[in-house]
Amino acid sequence: MTCLKKTGYIYAIENNFNLHVWIGRTTTRSIDECFQTHARLARSRPLCGFQQYMAVYGPENFSIRKIRTVRYTWTMELDLAEEEYSFLCDKGGSKSGAEGDLWSRMVVNDCPAVEFPSTSEVVKLALEHTVEAQPLVPDRFASLLLDERTLAVGTTIKEKLVNGKVYVSPLVLQWIWGHQCRDNFNHQLYHFFKVVNDHKIPHNYIGYREPLVSEFSEIQAEIDHLPTTELTVKRWLVMDAASFREALMLLPTPRCRLVRRYYLAMIECLRLYGCYIHELTHSELDLETQLEMDLKDLKFS
């Protein structure tokens, strides 16, 4: 199984009044489209801390530029590239080239808890985006309430699922820990496994002869480069989606705080989606009842 390389971009949004900068990444859209989305939401309905910041000072005082093109297989790799730039900006790292003047800049903090409007406001907003009484699909509904960075957490995790299971690879562990524990796989694995054991979270170690191995391209790539002596004793940690999610919710890393933020937000989204569907259904019933009454009035007039 071969995973094709994709192209993503790391960008910086700067302003003309201080040294603050916001680092972001994009996969399918151009950086100009990303900027237009931020500016539009800042003017109308900010969904994240940065858009609120942009709203205070006015989108016209901000500009965007690309700082790196990234070729990646998994979105986690793009997340790590984005995090590297945010980390080095805050720490005053040294780089040369187009992005060199970003270092020692203050990155705008963009990780507050998600704040939802009132239920009635959410329902009204969703109804405004409903066309011909066709209910919004859940993903579209969530995109009205959550910023792209929050939604991207769910997309990134889903990308690693294979038939409801996750291989806890070095890349996954690096994504979880980020710059807190860079390039220290044994440390990452130890603390991950400690959480799994302490909380008795179901997991499984599989060998190279297990049928499940064939479903994970990363494991197959490792097998191709392992000598026979190592291959016979090598084991890979695999978990089902629910167990992996539980482990993420318990780990004390910045990335896992984002994961908790995402899942808690999705629980609230699910509740609000139910309110929206209820209102939409009742509105349709009320409309049908009114039409029936109008037809009766017409018949007897």
Curated annotation (Swiss-Prot):
Lineage top rank: taxon = Viruses
What Pfam family does this protein match (any one)?
MSV199
Give the record's family classification: Belongs to the IIV-6 019R family.
Know the name of this protein?
Answer: Putative MSV199 domain-containing protein 093L
Q: Which organism is it from?
A: Invertebrate iridescent virus 3 (IIV-3)
